[in-house]
């Protein structure tokens, strides 16, 4: 089964908690703090495996949770960091945030990695908070929560050659002839509903990967007939082989077919019209095909490469393979990265995924309570051990240093009012 798009949920591992401990050895009267730090939580990492061709593994498992770091121990022993959770994906996988639609990673080469969900850092033990004024702190820090997000995995096949054309023009038949691929072939439209890949070898020992793509129809660039899903796989092909039914057996004019498909390639706005193209005039064994080919050559530009073939009698197949291989030899490496002029926040590629540290916001609940939210304050809230009075006092100092107290006063918060952070309730005290 070919799966080329799936949405999954990721949860990176939380950092381990730091602990509060003291040296208690004999003959050490002023032992001091000895609480170790927690270990780092595991990150969720995607890695390219060139042996994979589909996202099938993600169809049945949609939720991935990385391991938590170990807690710190006494004697200043740090907890062990958790090993990263590595998820294998095929070459050509794009990872997008469901929330923002930003491209988080574009994985092309074998072994290429991308950290998509960062594991939380370990909480600090009490020995980290020792100061001359407080040489024996009696509080520690919880581990930082790991990042949690939903992402969409989108596969764009990395094939050298893409077969495009209307349904039932012979694309699957051609692939089955020139490679060992066994695509489904039938005498009806849209027999092929998922791309098929095949490795093609020429008699002079040149080889390339050919993709048989589902048939396109007018309006495909606007999504008609699942056009976006099909055209997506053309984006990363170096050469486009445009197959046309030159016999007109479906009642369509070959030149009209040629214009319609090329119009869809232009409208898709991924520079597909700039790719080298070879026109394959198929079904030359049928009546009227030769006359149609003569007229077709008069209608198209002289620079268009046209190879007449018959996938039934297998005429000129070898000549076609040589033409494709020669065209690939001429093509330079194509930069498949996202255009710089595309709208930021929609198709922007982020080469380094870092956590955002936005400012806090203050809102009011229906009962009049003040609600403080923001990445930084919520992170501190989760890392505070509220069972420890010194840790609670430290959290209050952090809120003051961030300016939250002053901001609450400006919003009208007074003595005794309720302040909420992530479901926790506090009483505002002047």
UniProtKB/Swiss-Prot annotation:
InterPro entries: G_OBG, GTP-bd, GTP-bd_Obg/CgtA, GTP-bd_prot_GTP1/OBG_C_sf, GTP1-OBG_CS, GTP1_OBG_dom, GTP1_OBG_dom_sf, OBG_GTPase. The keyword Transferase does not apply. Its main location: cytoplasm. Pfam families: DUF1967, GTP1_OBG, MMR_HSR1. GTP binds at residues 165-172, 190-194, 212-215, 282-285, 310-312. GO terms for biological process: ribosome biogenesis. Residues 1-158 form the Obg domain. Its EC number is 3.6.5.-. Residues 352-430 form the OCT domain. One of its GO terms (cellular component) is cytoplasm. The keyword Kinase does not apply. Residues 159-329 form the OBG-type G domain. PROSITE patterns: G_OBG (PS51710), GTP1_OBG (PS00905), OBG (PS51883), OCT (PS51881). An essential GTPase which binds GTP, GDP and possibly (p)ppGpp with moderate affinity, with high nucleotide exchange rates and a fairly low GTP hydrolysis rate. Plays a role in control of the cell cycle, stress response, ribosome biogenesis and in those bacteria that undergo differentiation, in morphogenesis control. This is GTPase Obg. It comes from Staphylococcus haemolyticus (strain JCSC1435). The gene is obg.
């Amino acid at each position: 089964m070919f799966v080329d798009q799936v949405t999954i949920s990721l949860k990176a591992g939380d950092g381990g908690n730091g602990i509060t401990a003291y040296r208690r050895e004999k003959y050490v009267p002023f032992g001091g703090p000895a609480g170790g730090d927690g270990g780092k939580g595991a990150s969720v990492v995607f890695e390219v495996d060139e042996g994979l061709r589909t996202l099938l593994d993600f169809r049945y498992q949609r939720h991935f949770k990385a391991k938590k770091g170990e807690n710190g121990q006494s004697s200043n022993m740090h907890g062990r960091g958790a090993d990263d959770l590595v998820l294998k994906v095929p070459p050509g996988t794009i990872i997008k945030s469901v929330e923002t639609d930003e491209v988080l990673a574009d994985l092309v080469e074998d072994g290429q990695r991308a950290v998509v969900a960062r594991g939380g850092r370990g909480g600090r033990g009490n020995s980290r908070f020792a100061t001359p004024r407080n040489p024996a702190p009696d509080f520690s820090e919880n581990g930082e929560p790991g990042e949690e997000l939903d992402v969409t995995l989108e596969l764009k096949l990395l094939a050298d050659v893409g077969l495009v054309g209307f349904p039932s023009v012979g694309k699957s038949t051609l692939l089955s002839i020139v490679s060992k691929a066994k695509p489904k072939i039938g005498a009806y439209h849209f027999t092929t509903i998922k791309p098929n890949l095949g490795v093609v070898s020429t008699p002079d020992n040149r080889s390339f990967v050919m993709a048989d793509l589902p048939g396109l129809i007018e309006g495909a660039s606007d999504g008609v007939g699942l056009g976006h899903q099909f055209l997506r796989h053309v984006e990363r092909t170096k050469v486009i082989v445009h197959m046309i039914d030159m016999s007109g057996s479906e009642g369509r004019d070959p030149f009209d077919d040629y214009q319609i498909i090329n119009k869809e390639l232009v409208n898709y706005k991924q520079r597909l019209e700039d790719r080298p193209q070879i026109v394959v005039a198929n079904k030359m064994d049928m009546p009227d095909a030769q006359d149609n080919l003569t007229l077709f050559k008069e209608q198209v530009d002289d620079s268009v490469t046209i190879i007449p073939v018959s996938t039934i009698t297998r005429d000129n197949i070898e000549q076609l393979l040589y033409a494709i291989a020669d065209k690939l030899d001429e093509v330079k490496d194509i930069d498949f990265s996202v255009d710089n002029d595309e709208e930021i926040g929609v198709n922007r590629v982020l080469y380094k995924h870092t956590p955002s540290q936005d400012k806090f916001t203050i809102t009011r609940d229906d009962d009049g309570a003040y609600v403080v939210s923001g990445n930084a304050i919520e992170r501190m809230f989760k890392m505070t051990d509220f069972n420890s009075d010194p840790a609670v006092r430290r959290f209050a100092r952090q809120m003051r240093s961030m300016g939250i107290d002053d901001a609450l006063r400006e919003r009208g918060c007074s003595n005794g009012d309720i302040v909420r952070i992530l479901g926790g309730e506090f009483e505002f005290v002047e």
